[in-house]
Amino acid sequence: MGCVLLFLLLVCVPVVLPQGLRCLFCPVTSLNSSCAPVVTECPVQELCYTADGRFGRSSVLFRKGCMLRADCSRSRHQMIRGNNISFSFSCCGGHYCNSQPRAEPGGRLLLLLLPAAALTAAGAL
């Protein structure tokens, strides 16, 4: 009787195991291309990240996935098609926190120039 009770207890009570974050994964992708992200569950000790790949001063690539917290503050260099690309990482600790769309190249500059263009067109400058 005791073995049956123990068996029923083990079967009926769910085992709670620590779960990792759910993040989006995109392989290295060109900024002018799109990625169909795949949902992935990170190991418990990892965070979600979005990486910005730069060639010189220009953002040219991005990627998303999971990485160890200790690696979030490190930049990495990778040779891609003969070009030395420097990746910097932005990590976050919530489910799907790396799902925000990437900024379009030059988007911030465009936002800064729009008010000046509007004033110029209105003859205020």
From Swiss-Prot:
Domain UPAR/Ly6: 23-98
GO annotation, biological process: fusion of sperm to egg plasma membrane involved in single fertilization; single fertilization; sperm-egg recognition
Modification(s) after translation: N-glycosylated.
Lipidation (GPI-anchor amidated asparagine): 98
Main location, first listed in the record: membrane
Tissue: Highly expressed in oocytes. Not expressed in testis.
UniProt protein name: Protein Bouncer
Matches recorded under SUPFAM superfamilies: Snake toxin-like (SSF57302)
UniProt keyword terms in alphabetical order: Cell membrane, Disulfide bond, Fertilization, Glycoprotein, GPI-anchor, Lipoprotein, Membrane, Signal
Glycosylation sites: 32, 84
PANTHER family for the chain: SPERM ACROSOME MEMBRANE-ASSOCIATED PROTEIN 4
Matching InterPro entries: LY6_UPA_recep-like, Snake_toxin-like_sf, SPACA4/Bouncer
SUBUNIT field: Interacts with spermatocyte complex composed of izumo1, spaca6 and tmem81.
Disulfide-bond pairs as recorded: 23-48, 26-35, 42-66, 72-91, 92-97
Result when mutating residue 84 to A: Glycosylation-defective mutant. Does not affect ability to promote fertilization and mediate sperm-egg binding
Signal peptide: 1-18
Pfam families attached to this UniProt entry: UPAR_LY6
Compartments it resides in: Cell membrane
Propeptide section residues: 99-125
Gene (name only): bncr
